[in-house]
């Protein structure tokens, strides 16, 4: 497997307690990075740290849909280190069903996590990347955001918004050494 050199780099991986997010975190650790995994589920976070057993893996319980929570955790990290890499992986699919029957509170929750969570993390972390003239951001989306999935309008809409946010942010940062 190809290895990368991320020594002296710090990554934040949202939704990093399990699945794809944890796999990404492990890969960064193998490449020498310091990694902070964020998730809403402390039990899963502790389990991930116990499984990985790497002194460069740290965790925080973070609700990415809450900007103040994100901002506080970013400040905690940046008081000791730069944040060089952001992997916005956290997301939820929610229940399926036709739009006209969809629970409004659930719709808002899905969009709040899948779109606003991505915005909140970028909004809080990008200034640190600009200050340090370096950053890499990956916003995990879905083909559902491009094509739309029947009976998954909230998920499709949130991911479509995340795709648009990614394109816009990439253009805003095009003149800096920050790739989105």
Model regions: which residues?
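Substrate-binding pocket helix/loop in short-chain dehydrogenase/reductase
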Residues: 97-99, 106-108
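Canonical Rossmann dinucleotide-binding motif of NAD(H)/NADP(H)-dependent dehydrogenases/reductases
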Residues: 4-36
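Active-site helix of classical SDR
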Residues: 122, 158, 166
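Active-site loop immediately N-terminal to the catalytic Tyr-X3-Lys motif
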Residues: 100, 147-153, 175-176
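Alpha-helical segment proximal to the catalytic Tyr-Lys
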Residues: 127, 171-175
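The beta1-alpha1 cofactor-binding region of Rossmann-like NAD(H)/NADP(H)-dependent oxidoreductases
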Residues: 42-43, 60-72, 104
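Residue(s) in the substrate-gating loop at a strand-loop-helix junction
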Residues: 142
């Amino acid at each position: 497997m190809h290895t990368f050199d991320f020594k002296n780099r710090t990554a934040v991986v949202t939704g990093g307690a399990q699945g794809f997010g944890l796999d990404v975190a492990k890969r960064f650790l193998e490449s020498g990075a310091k990694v902070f995994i964020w998730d809403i589920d402390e039990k899963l976070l502790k389990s991930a740290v116990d499984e990985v057993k790497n002194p460069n893996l740290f965790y925080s319980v973070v609700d990415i849909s809450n900007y103040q929570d994100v901002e506080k955790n970013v400040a905690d990290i940046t008081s000791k280190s730069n944040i060089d890499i952001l992997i916005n992986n956290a997301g939820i699919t929610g229940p399926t069903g036709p739009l006209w029957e969809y629970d409004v509170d659930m719709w808002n929750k899905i969009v709040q996590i899948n779109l606003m969570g991505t915005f909140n993390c970028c909004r809080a972390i990008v200034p640190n990347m600009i200050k340090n003239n370096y950053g890499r951001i990956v916003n995990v989306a879905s083909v559902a955001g491009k094509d739309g999935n029947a009976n998954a309008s909230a998920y499709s809409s949130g991911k479509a918004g995340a795709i648009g946010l990614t394109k816009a942010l990439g253009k805003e940062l095009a003149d800096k050494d920050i790739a989105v």
